[in-house]
UniProtKB/Swiss-Prot annotation:
HAMAP family: Urease_gamma. One of its GO terms (biological process) is urea catabolic process. Its EC number is 3.5.1.5. One of its GO terms (cellular component) is cytoplasm. This is Urease subunit gamma.
Length: 100
């Protein structure tokens, strides 16, 4: 399988998000990379599904709570920015303060 660097990066994000989701399902608190991967994957998949930027900005803030992540992680993640491909082109999605 021949993947471009961009495709490799997206695949790595989805694998990391899958690991994070499995850990969360087992009751483990997520670390910084796991939390960011989960939010990023949510945005990428939502864009692929045809959701709007506004919908993804809103739902990205509801994905994780302080109870889902290790102590101090919410303060470390101020914004998550993802360049996602929507049906009408590529757009930058920014989720401000994604963990409340």
């Amino acid at each position: 399988m021949q993947l471009t660097p961009h495709e490799q990066e997206r695949l790595l994000i989805h694998v990391a998000a899958d690991v994070a989701e499995k850990r969360r399902a087992r009751g483990l608190k997520l670390n910084h990379p796991e939390a960011v991967a989960l939010i990023t994957s949510h945005i990428l998949e939502g864009a692929r599904d045809g959701r709007t930027v506004a919908e993804l900005m809103s739902s990205g803030r509801k994905l994780l709570t302080r109870d889902d992540v290790m102590e101090g992680i919410p303060e470390m993640i101020h914004d998550v920015q993802v360049e996602a491909t929507f049906p009408d082109g590529t757009k930058l999605v920014t989720v401000h303060d994604p963990i409340v």
